[in-house]
Amino acid sequence: MSGLTHFDAAGHAHMVDVGGKQETQRIAVARGTIRMLPATFELIRDGKAKKGDVLGVARIAAIQGAKRTADLIPLCHPLALTRVAVDFELDDALPGVHCIAQVETFGRTGVEMEALTAVQVGLLTVYDMCKAVDRGMVIGDVSVTEKRGGKSGDWKAQA
């Protein structure tokens, strides 16, 4: 298990010690998609969902999700985030919605988990607010698309 940082030599899970790492600017971007029926897409696009502003509520939920990541992922370090930006892109061709989250901090560990959690919580909120009209929505294609900072350097997913 030498390549997995969250396990010790005996194979027991532990929280990684980041105390000796240098503090640097850390940035991560993640994205994901929720696919839905055309009628559901139209409700969101036209702002006519019964529960209100779907994407506005989902944006706040995504930000809250990023802030609460350490409460949800057992071995994730609690971080003082300096920025969480969440955007939604409507995609007529799917039909569906893409969620993109960029999370930043100045610290000793990356913010990939916070960006992924923001995207998932944002998309789950879209599902929650629209499930009365479309229980068949599908969340998928969630991934980190970019990370910057830290000892391992910068990384960007292949397009």
From Swiss-Prot:
<dbReference type="InterPro" id="IPR036522">
    <property type="entry name" value="MoaC_sf"/>
</dbReference>
<keyword id="KW-0456">Lyase</keyword>
<feature type="binding site">
    <location>
        <begin position="75"/>
        <end position="77"/>
    </location>
    <ligand>
        <name>substrate</name>
    </ligand>
</feature>
<dbReference type="GO" id="GO:0061799">
    <property type="term" value="F:cyclic pyranopterin monophosphate synthase activity"/>
</dbReference>
<keyword id="KW-0501">Molybdenum cofactor biosynthesis</keyword>
<dbReference type="GO" id="GO:0006777">
    <property type="term" value="P:Mo-molybdopterin cofactor biosynthetic process"/>
</dbReference>
<dbReference type="Pfam" id="PF01967">
    <property type="entry name" value="MoaC"/>
</dbReference>
<dbReference type="InterPro" id="IPR002820">
    <property type="entry name" value="Mopterin_CF_biosynth-C_dom"/>
</dbReference>
<feature type="binding site">
    <location>
        <begin position="113"/>
        <end position="114"/>
    </location>
    <ligand>
        <name>substrate</name>
    </ligand>
</feature>
<dbReference type="InterPro" id="IPR023045">
    <property type="entry name" value="MoaC"/>
</dbReference>
<comment type="similarity">
    <text>Belongs to the MoaC family.</text>
</comment>
<comment type="pathway">
    <text>Cofactor biosynthesis; molybdopterin biosynthesis.</text>
</comment>
<protein>
    <recommendedName>
        <fullName>Cyclic pyranopterin monophosphate synthase</fullName>
        <ecNumber>4.6.1.17</ecNumber>
    </recommendedName>
</protein>
<dbReference type="InterPro" id="IPR050105">
    <property type="entry name" value="MoCo_biosynth_MoaA/MoaC"/>
</dbReference>
<dbReference type="InterPro" id="IPR047594">
    <property type="entry name" value="MoaC_bact/euk"/>
</dbReference>
<comment type="function">
    <text>Catalyzes the conversion of (8S)-3',8-cyclo-7,8-dihydroguanosine 5'-triphosphate to cyclic pyranopterin monophosphate (cPMP).</text>
</comment>
<comment type="subunit">
    <text>Homohexamer; trimer of dimers.</text>
</comment>
<feature type="active site">
    <location>
        <position position="128"/>
    </location>
</feature>
